[in-house]
């Protein structure tokens, strides 16, 4: 690791985040010396898009203190970081790649040189959190090693796992114009089993690099690769360079064959324990878990853990979570383990498909129960779910809602899931910064949960991780994860399991105790899964066996959801969360029909061009049917929409717009009263971030017109904006008439 000496920690003052205290404390202090509030220490990595200064300012914005090189400490963690109102294009990729946050650092905020006389003299500096840096207890710093340095120091399974992860990032990085990041080995850092990106590097050319460029880069590591992997790796790189392996999915399948061969040289020991508690403030426990055991079974190569959280405040949340547990556990428990031989039938994609089917079955079972009991509105049962499957060195995580999964190894902590809520959706779309998005109204409201809509509109996130070292996986409901309790306590409560100073059962009890004493507002459920990896000296693998993994080459499959869905524009009737049990005004539950005209060239395929137009395809989005008490508002005015850029043309291939397609508005669009060119625009506009549905397509001589259906709140008007709020015990009808804020609720 790269070492460095930071500034004097005793000289740095860290201000208490408690708004009623804000006392200064020494950086070394864990708790505020006045009020005993935990002091979060956020060490951030500074970047300057487009330039790299030789020296960084010692203080930024009178709050960020330079500790070493480009590492800053936020001395006012209780104050929201500054961010611009509009997301600059050069850092949007960080937001849209938010679901890959265990690999890619995220934007914390922006800052400027505090010593500068003018902001114009101080170009924006962006501060990244979750960067591959780590403070040491003795005050020195280390940066995780880049892959060039680490390659020769790890075993073959680690090497193959790193390659698989880079391929897993490739497609999304290409789409966001940052594939060059993966071609710069200085930006590709490693932490045990995991790839960590230092910062994103934009592509210089509009033409995305091909997979052959990865092959050229990786071939530099052939001389430091030892048998039995060397011959396989050399041929694998050549196939990438020659184009015989031309898709990431195809290359991943070959790597998986080699991983399965090498897995016989390891023993994987999984154990799981669960614990659920009603909590101090609830009359019943709406959480559920699987398996129902505090004492772990003997270690084995495959385990299953599930946590469900009945949507708080809904009658029958405990029934919904119980139905989900019984349905999913029964279906998933019957899935066969992954093969340990490359000659066995490929099964990982099948495994993920089976999990999705199990989630759909659970959703249907809860929905049918709701219908049989004629439950409407708040009476309808719903639940979140998070599923963890350990299978040799494969970890499969699937989830719906805001129940979470975390992974802890001997060095680091990873949040593996992204909540299905409004705040995360805005970040994934590139519209908001996470630190500020979570403080917006209805930010924590769920956009999907089991039992709240048809399975055809349910989009579970299913992911696969390759873990080749001892680790702990935590699944939990938000009774524990709220207020960053896991982030605060993972070192003291979870890492000791790995050095055998505490047990799974004891750790589970401690986590429940923390949830009840430091949160206490909800039920709490945890499932702890432990993996221990030991060598298997009874088996060896030679070069010939690994070379056989290249014959025959697999055909290029359709891309699979083996990773997080990135920038998925979730458009749905929003499910209330525990903090706000209403259908928020952000939802599209109340449709508004308008006619939209784009001043476009007569090539309708260009409507959906992601790079240039204001409408972004949202065809993959879940759009549950509106509730029975919603009503469609028909406007008699015919409204056209001004184009975002009439001069824009494109040669990219895009799918034509179709009736029923959902689109995301990329920039605010001006609306007109009719299709007559001389008509002045109306006061209202469709806001950036609005999600609309194509109801009809009409063509005139020089324009295309769209009839769109949109949420009333997405029409900005001369009156005030409709924004319903409620506490957890309140239920409101969504706004029925917002065109000019007539406040009919």
For each predicted feature, which ranges?
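N-terminal sensory and localization modules of signal-transduction and trafficking proteins
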Residues: 22, 46-53
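Short Cys/His-rich metal-coordination motifs, predominantly Zn2+-binding knuckles/fingers
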Residues: 19-21, 35
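Short, Lys/Arg- and Gly-enriched loop/turn segments at beta-strand edges
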Residues: 483, 672-675, 701-707
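PP2C/PPM-type serine/threonine phosphatase catalytic domain
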Residues: 6, 13, 27-39, 66, ...
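Long, charge-rich alpha-helical interaction segments
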Residues: 208, 212, 221-222
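Non-catalytic signal-transmission and effector/linker regions of two-component phosphorelay proteins
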Residues: 2-8
